[in-house]
């Protein structure tokens, strides 16, 4: 069951940004301000599962924008270890593809599952 949940969350992180229509930032908000505001909103959610899912989405969006600071804050705030590891894995790979290798490595090191952490670090090292 945990295995399937990981893939569902990973799929949502990859698909959700493509589902957004139009301008993602509200009027008057820059990308970084919007990400910080979204992080604060997600962190304020009381339902743990919903909070973790929202933080995972914000982490993925922050990684796509190259904002490793927000990525790390989101990942540190996720309570479920599997969700945390999946968000860190996806974000690390996205940061690496955005040529943010050092930040990607720092995020990959946040993964607690050794096999998953090694896989992320290998992808970063190989440039995958």
Give the location of each predicted region.
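Non-catalytic tandem-repeat scaffold regions and their flanking low-complexity/translocation tails
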Residues: 15-128
């Amino acid at each position: 069951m945990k295995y399937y949940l990981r893939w569902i969350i990973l799929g949502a992180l990859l698909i959700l940004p493509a589902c957004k229509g139009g301008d993602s930032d509200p009027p008057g908000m820059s990308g970084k301000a919007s990400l910080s505001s979204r992080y604060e909103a997600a962190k304020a959610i009381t339902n743990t599962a919903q909070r973790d899912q929202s933080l995972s989405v914000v982490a993925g969006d922050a990684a796509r924008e190259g904002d490793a600071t927000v990525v790390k804050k989101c990942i540190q705030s996720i309570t479920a270890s599997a969700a945390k590891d999946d968000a860190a894995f996806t974000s690390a790979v996205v940061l690496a593809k955005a040529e943010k290798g050092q930040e990607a490595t720092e995020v990959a090191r946040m993964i607690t599952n050794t096999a998953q952490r090694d896989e992320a670090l290998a992808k970063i090292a190989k440039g995958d």
